[in-house]
Amino acid sequence: DYLNKIFLGKPKRVLVERAETGENFKKSYNAALARLRNKSWNWLTFPGLEPHKDLTEELQNWIIAQRAAKKTFKAVLPCSAANNEGIVNFSSSGIKVGAKTYSAYEYCARIAGLLAGLSMTESATYQVLSEIDSITESLTPNEDIDEGKFILINDGEKVKVARGVNSLHILSGDKTEDMKKIKIIEGMDLMRDDIRSAFENNYIGINNSYDNKVMFVAAINQYFDGLVREGVLYGDAENTADILWIQFCES
């Protein structure tokens, strides 16, 4: 059922890691995370988390640590007030689909599949989940969104995503208002992965000359131009890379 829910969102690829039940659960869970650390993926969900609610904070901290290490991992977790752009705090419950009612824990898989399947020009905001008959509706949806909660709403005809936000809601340091939006973080992560991949595959190991630096910067700017044409970057913004020179002078 969880995999079927994920595929409703039409993700390009799905990785499945298995964890044992019973006394070996924690060991196999840690082994699964270790395997995932060195794989390429974007969105994580853990459909069987509800019996192990104590792991929610541990899992969110793992994602945050991986992002600090320049990974672009993100996760959909239930009722997780992480205040981090890499965590989507799914907070709707009482989700009725046919004869079955799902909790937030159980429906995170559907949300992860939805987010993974969106193109870079699409937002999660107002995306319709047509299979849902009803939900336990929030009495304070605007306040929930402001607190970094990803919730579903019923407009009287259909159930849909209220707004495509992650759990970031208290800004500090280099965190900006735009970074509360899942779509913005997806674009930032895409550029980080693509530029790093281009550098590692085409420029590491060659002479670090000025001409080669100029070639790399030109390739990045050409890449930015492509993102503008595709609608990922705003065309009226200054989407350019350059070489920064710092000269130290002795007094």
Question: What positions do the PLM features span?
Answer:
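Surface-exposed assembly/interface segments
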Residues: 1-251
